[in-house]
Amino acid sequence: MARKLAAGNWKMNGVEADLAEVDALGEAVAAANCDVLLCPPATLIAPMAKRAGLMDLYVGGQTCHTAASGAHTGDVSAAMLADAGASHVILGHSERRADHGERSEDVAAQVTAAIDANLIAIICVGETEAERDANVTLNVVSSQLAGSIPTGATPAQIVVAYEPVWAIGTGRTPTLEQIAEVHDHIRSELAARRGSAANDIPLLYGGSVKPGNAAEIFAVSNVDGALVGGASLKASDFGGIIAALSAA
């Protein structure tokens, strides 16, 4: 049985003053019947981790390099994330795939680096609007899963997040039936490779999750939580999503 996880991705948002939102999450985190994770920009991981240490809150990174160290100006290694206090890292997010040309094989190498640094890798998969319209969503997701998850990764070391690219930050969400179809497919694909152990891998939905639609999304089969973007920036919004997942 997979653990429920509410994960917030701050993306390129936030300065130290915004950590007041973390303090404001304290009550929601204390009452949560799920794991709660925030992934801020790299500059905020260490100060956020200090606050998180006072509550049952995990902190993560948003990407990592495949190398442990070296001449890679501007990059951050998985070991650096861990040293700053991170326990998780988001990998293969559609914005990284699009903006930085990261391919599934690159993501797999990043996952290996993350695991070597004792980080849990949140591996993102999902289709573009054109791929959805062409009815190749499941093929795309299968290909990304096969290419992005290294063979040696164990269920305890990974989380999979389904994020339809066309729903991220747009206010649009797939129908509940569409979410169920993809999440059931992901579970089936993982089971084909990992057997019954695949049931221990949390499957998150990401794409315009808000307090108002969270409960119905969390009622969908094989949805174990959410990867939340904009709504994770405000404690009032993210707290509502945490409460909805706790009640699911």
From Swiss-Prot:
<dbReference type="InterPro" id="IPR022896">
    <property type="entry name" value="TrioseP_Isoase_bac/euk"/>
</dbReference>
<dbReference type="GO" id="GO:0019563">
    <property type="term" value="P:glycerol catabolic process"/>
</dbReference>
<feature type="binding site">
    <location>
        <position position="169"/>
    </location>
    <ligand>
        <name>substrate</name>
    </ligand>
</feature>
<protein>
    <recommendedName>
        <fullName>Triosephosphate isomerase</fullName>
        <ecNumber>5.3.1.1</ecNumber>
    </recommendedName>
</protein>
<comment type="similarity">
    <text>Belongs to the triosephosphate isomerase family.</text>
</comment>
<keyword id="KW-0963">Cytoplasm</keyword>
<feature type="binding site">
    <location>
        <begin position="229"/>
        <end position="230"/>
    </location>
    <ligand>
        <name>substrate</name>
    </ligand>
</feature>
<dbReference type="InterPro" id="IPR035990">
    <property type="entry name" value="TIM_sf"/>
</dbReference>
<comment type="pathway">
    <text>Carbohydrate degradation; glycolysis; D-glyceraldehyde 3-phosphate from glycerone phosphate: step 1/1.</text>
</comment>
<dbReference type="GO" id="GO:0005829">
    <property type="term" value="C:cytosol"/>
</dbReference>
<dbReference type="GO" id="GO:0006096">
    <property type="term" value="P:glycolytic process"/>
</dbReference>
<keyword id="KW-0413">Isomerase</keyword>
<comment type="subunit">
    <text>Homodimer.</text>
</comment>
<dbReference type="GO" id="GO:0006094">
    <property type="term" value="P:gluconeogenesis"/>
</dbReference>
<feature type="active site" description="Electrophile">
    <location>
        <position position="93"/>
    </location>
</feature>
<dbReference type="GO" id="GO:0046166">
    <property type="term" value="P:glyceraldehyde-3-phosphate biosynthetic process"/>
</dbReference>
<feature type="binding site">
    <location>
        <begin position="9"/>
        <end position="11"/>
    </location>
    <ligand>
        <name>substrate</name>
    </ligand>
</feature>
<dbReference type="InterPro" id="IPR000652">
    <property type="entry name" value="Triosephosphate_isomerase"/>
</dbReference>
<feature type="binding site">
    <location>
        <position position="208"/>
    </location>
    <ligand>
        <name>substrate</name>
    </ligand>
</feature>
<dbReference type="InterPro" id="IPR013785">
    <property type="entry name" value="Aldolase_TIM"/>
</dbReference>
<comment type="pathway">
    <text>Carbohydrate biosynthesis; gluconeogenesis.</text>
</comment>
<keyword id="KW-0324">Glycolysis</keyword>
<feature type="active site" description="Proton acceptor">
    <location>
        <position position="163"/>
    </location>
</feature>
<comment type="function">
    <text>Involved in the gluconeogenesis. Catalyzes stereospecifically the conversion of dihydroxyacetone phosphate (DHAP) to D-glyceraldehyde-3-phosphate (G3P).</text>
</comment>
<dbReference type="GO" id="GO:0004807">
    <property type="term" value="F:triose-phosphate isomerase activity"/>
</dbReference>
<keyword id="KW-0312">Gluconeogenesis</keyword>
<dbReference type="Pfam" id="PF00121">
    <property type="entry name" value="TIM"/>
</dbReference>
<dbReference type="InterPro" id="IPR020861">
    <property type="entry name" value="Triosephosphate_isomerase_AS"/>
</dbReference>
